[in-house]
Amino acid sequence: LKNLIRTVLRSSWFQRAVGFLAASFLRLVWRTNRFTFDPADVYEIVEPQMPAIFAFWHGQHFLTPFIKTKDIHRVKVLISRHRDGEFNALAAERLRIGTIRGSGDHGSAFQRKGGVGAFKEMVHALDQGYNVALTADVPKRSRIAGLGIIMLARESGRTIMPLAMATSRYWRLKNWDRTTINLPFGRGALVGGEMIKVPPDASSEMMEELRARLEATLNEVTDRAYAQVGRPQGPRQGMGQGIGHG
């Protein structure tokens, strides 16, 4: 029975079905939540900097495809090669978002999980005029920004835009990144923080300073997003507190 379940989970038809259902559910969430934008002119602020690097926290990224509100907002999103990532990739493609497969990690795992190839592909995508969206923290180190995204900004010359999207209704899982599954029929907020530019000759000390600034900014915009939907510090409270109600 275990082998049968494993075969089904890995089958292309099952993964496509899950991707379709996930995309349909996310559309429902986006269309049935009353979204506000902070600042109100966030797109007018960031558009002159496009193509840009959109930074989110792990576990707070399910609505990332909807940062694209115009055709000029071409976006590719970084998604891991893990089996769970396959579902996310298929859902993103259903939502007409390009994908780059690979993930950030530590030490040799960076090579094994396709980090080097993904880094080069992200630089190329930015050169081709695509915005790139990715999580700033790497697996098992929730809410700690890695240097990878800072290196991407230095290499590409593009600006980092820290973003957070929250809904008043959600499920929060008991895992390392406190994954938040956004739910329909509530309020939503998209919050942008102060943009970060990395000079091409940035020293290691400056890189660390900018990494810490990105981390602080992402925490700030995430807190603001949840406060605006009436769920102050929703994802940063104790894990596993169930559903948030709008």
What is each PLM-predicted segment?
Residues 1-68, 72-74, 90, 96-98, ...:
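Membrane-anchoring hydrophobic helices of lipid-metabolizing enzymes
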Residues 57-61, 81-84, 185:
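Short glycine-enriched loops at secondary-structure junctions
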Residues 61, 139-141, 168:
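Solvent-exposed loop/turn segments at secondary-structure junctions
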Residues 78, 102, 135, 162-165:
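Generic beta-sheet signal
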Residues 80-127:
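Conserved nucleotide-cofactor-binding alpha/beta core module
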Residues 115-156:
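Catalytic-site beta-strand/loop segments enriched in glycine and acidic/polar residues
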Residues 144-204:
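A cross-family acyltransferase "interaction/gating" segment
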